[in-house]
Swiss-Prot record:
Disulfide bonds: none annotated. InterPro entries: PduO/GlcC-like (IPR005624), PduO/GlcC-like_sf (IPR038084), YBR137W-like (IPR010371). Pfam families: HbpS-like. This is UPF0303 protein Bcep1808_1522. It comes from Burkholderia vietnamiensis (strain G4 / LMG 22486) (Burkholderia cepacia (strain R1808)). It comes from the Bacteria. Belongs to the UPF0303 family.
Amino acid sequence: MDIAHDLQSIGAQEQALVFPQFDPARAWALGNRMHALATARGHAIAIDIATFGQPLFFAALAGATPDNADWVRRKRNVVAHFRRSSYAIGLRMQQAGATLADKHGLPISEYSPHGGSFPLTVAGAGVIGSITASGLPQRADHEFVVEALCAELGHDYAVLALERS
């Protein structure tokens, strides 16, 4: 895995995966799409869609644990703080040889810079929340969210997917 290349690709994902508008009905549709995709693949994950301060969709699939819900919360906090994908922030920390606690004073009990939370961006408004998955390895959590967003927004996932490592 080439961190610099992944960071460039994640930046392209974040630029492309923008909603023209977003409301609770759209959150419900996206959440159900993610639930169906995860169920079909047998993923034991938690899925969360929220605007900052308001939960819109949450599901814990068979096999997911309360720990997954806590990972969701901590990854979501990273997106809220940085307005970037939690995976991008984690890769940047890895690249710098630092932690969020070292570099930003953010406790690991509240912030997890691991893949799986993606900015919920609306054209003309910017980042208004996050779409998060937890239960797979971090790169797979990230890509699961990106794949679902591509399907929801009509983008070709093959074009935006991270290179296989």
